[in-house]
Amino acid sequence: VTLLPRIDRWPNLFVSRTFSKVYGMAALRCGCLFSSERHMSFVRKAQSPYSVNMLAAMAARIAIKDEKFIQDYVLEVLAAREVLYVEFEKLGIPYYESQANFVLFQAGERAIEIRDKLRDRGVLVRDRSYEIPGCVRVTIGTRDQVERFLKELKEIW
């Protein structure tokens, strides 16, 4: 869902896109901003002349053209998220439902331990206890990635 087609209808609308999530290009630190020509002229005045490196710009141009890949990937992530929810329910792990490509689950006092043990097994999650005590954030990727995460989590839970 995007409001990009509405930019001409709503003069104060800005739409931003990140290439970090669905496109899997977080290391390139690339995103883009869309608005009316009038608003973009103000943005350009404040923009750094080299705000995006050439490699990131080229990768973004190529990635944005492959709409089918993105649609397929989003559907796969949605299905994988449901698998994750079902398994969390079976394991009795409290979690927060999400509309994003990540889920927070409650690990209590073991949050840092869980993060570290998963890291030792090659699975990276983020401890979010400083924001929500006891919470761990897991990014949802493909079904294979979610199943790998669940396999490792079950062994240490």
Where are these regions (language model features)?
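Conserved PLP-binding catalytic core of the aspartate aminotransferase-like
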Residues: V77-L78, E82, V86-R121
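Short, flexible helix/strand-to-coil boundary loops that buttress conserved ligand/catalytic motifs
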Residues: I7, V43-Q47, V74, F88, ...
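PLP-dependent aminotransferase class I/II
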Residues: N12-F88, I93-Y96
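Conserved PLP phosphate-binding loop immediately N-terminal to the Schiff-base lysine helix
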Residues: V1-L4, Y23
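Short hydrophobic/aromatic beta-strand micro-patches
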Residues: F34, L104-Q106, T139-G141
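Nucleotide-activated donor-binding/catalytic signature segment of Leloir-type glycosyltransferases, i.e.
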Residues: P5-L13
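Short acidic/glycine-enriched loop/turn segments that link adjacent beta-strands
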Residues: A27, Q99-A100, E131-G134
